[in-house]
Amino acid sequence: MQVYLVGGAVRDALLNRKVIERDYVVVGATPQEMLSQGFTQVGKDFPVFLHPKTQEEYALARTERKSGKGYTGFVCDASSSVTLEEDLLRRDLTVNAIAQDNLGNLIDPYGGKKDLENHLLRHVSEAFSEDPLRVFRVARFATRYAYLGFTIANETMALMQSMAESGELSTLSAERVWQETKRSLLEKTPHVFFTVLNQAHGLNDWFAELESNLDAAIATLKTAVALENAAKENFDKSGQLENKPLETKIPESSSSGTTTLIIRFTALLAHLNEEEAKRLCNRLKVQNQLSEIVILACKFKDFLLNTQNSPADLLALFNGCDAWRRSERFTLLLKAFAPYAHYKDLDWQRQQEHIENALSAANQVNVQDIIATGVKGPAIKEALNQAKLDAIASIGE
């Protein structure tokens, strides 16, 4: 039995990046031998085991043979006769097909180290085309390492284009596509993911709504990142956040990343109309917390951008967004809308403060005070709306 460190841990160590997790491949072993040494089997489709102490993953060396459509149609051979080189051959990119033994020696049969030095993402073999998810994985790796100058090899891009044109991308599950998308959106240069997919002709099946206005979507996504970076720079200089509008406050870190993800995804989709945003979010099965913000931004963007809103317009905005009961969501909507407003050259700080002041004024209206005047039945709602309109109008006086 021989054990090798493989994949991302080797790659990132060679790039002097922080290694987050370690995966190992085991050559010359059987499942029974692994279990007898205290490992716990967790893999359903192929033998993967958790180390009894570290809980790190150890997978038996395996080969894969295409047997059907999509990313699940494979026959796996994980017998003890499978060699390390055979296991590495099935991997997607050469930079992910480097192994390291327990003495620190590299086993690199497919030139991954040289490709790392040349900042090149290149497929290991023609078997790359058997798994359509790899189009999205390569786009994600290109996104992650773009700041280091990595590019995709021409022959790999050609293969990705042929895979997209074959229709195989449509066989993927929404969950897998969204997972790759979500992870890419939290990288330093998230726009690269969509640029690569466009180059690979891979937007049509999952992101068709973006195709007609991709340049604007990417520009707005870049704006979101620029606002975050400016906030971080201000934070680093001052050591604390100043009293600044929501859009310039430092975002959550990518470890939790929920707020950052919402802001960036909203920036990407803000150019769409409401129905287009709904279609895209439903197709990808985006979680409600995120899709609600995106759809509201697309539905009410004209109200949010209009600096001449009447009290009736603002009340319609608050009612439509249920800002009364969902105040935290509305606050997050304003934060997420900032990149699009900046893209449109709007003084968002001033506009946001105006909207927030109007909402605060309307929230001061107490329905019990209205009822106390003797108003009854349907007239209560009418009187409540009128009182809110009067309160909103008063902030400009």
From Swiss-Prot:
Cofactor(s) needed for function: Mg(2+)
Gene3D superfamilies assigned to the protein according to its UniProt record, in alphabetical order: Beta Polymerase, domain 2 (3.30.460.10), cca-adding enzyme, domain 2 (1.10.3090.10)
Ranges of residues in domain HD: 213-324
PANTHER family cross-referenced by the UniProt entry: MULTIFUNCTIONAL CCA PROTEIN
Miscellaneous section: A single active site specifically recognizes both ATP and CTP and is responsible for their addition.
Organism: Alteromonas mediterranea (strain DSM 17117 / CIP 110805 / LMG 28347 / Deep ecotype)
Keywords: ATP-binding, Magnesium, Metal-binding, Nucleotide-binding, Nucleotidyltransferase, RNA repair, RNA-binding, Transferase, tRNA processing
InterPro entries: CCA_bact (IPR012006), HD_domain (IPR006674), NT_sf (IPR043519), PolA_pol_head_dom (IPR002646), PolyA_RNA-bd (IPR032828), tRNA_CCA-adding_enzyme (IPR050124)
Residues where ATP binds: 8, 11, 91, 137, 140
Top EC group: transferase
Record-stated family: Belongs to the tRNA nucleotidyltransferase/poly(A) polymerase family. Bacterial CCA-adding enzyme type 2 subfamily.
The protein, known as: CCA-adding enzyme
Record Pfam families: PolyA_pol, PolyA_pol_RNAbd
Residues bound to CTP: 8, 11, 91, 137, 140
Enzyme Commission number: 2.7.7.72
GO molecular function: ATP binding; CCA tRNA nucleotidyltransferase activity; magnesium ion binding; tRNA binding
Purpose of the protein: Catalyzes the addition and repair of the essential 3'-terminal CCA sequence in tRNAs without using a nucleic acid template. Adds these three nucleotides in the order of C, C, and A to the tRNA nucleotide-73, using CTP and ATP as substrates and producing inorganic pyrophosphate. tRNA 3'-terminal CCA addition is required both for tRNA processing and repair. Also involved in tRNA surveillance by mediating tandem CCA addition to generate a CCACCA at the 3' terminus of unstable tRNAs. While stable tRNAs receive only 3'-terminal CCA, unstable tRNAs are marked with CCACCA and rapidly degraded.
Reaction(s) catalysed (UniProt annotation): a tRNA precursor + 2 CTP + ATP = a tRNA with a 3' CCA end + 3 diphosphate; a tRNA with a 3' CCA end + 2 CTP + ATP = a tRNA with a 3' CCACCA end + 3 diphosphate
Alphabetical GO biological process terms: RNA repair; tRNA 3'-terminal CCA addition
Residues given in the record as Mg(2+) binding sites: 21, 23
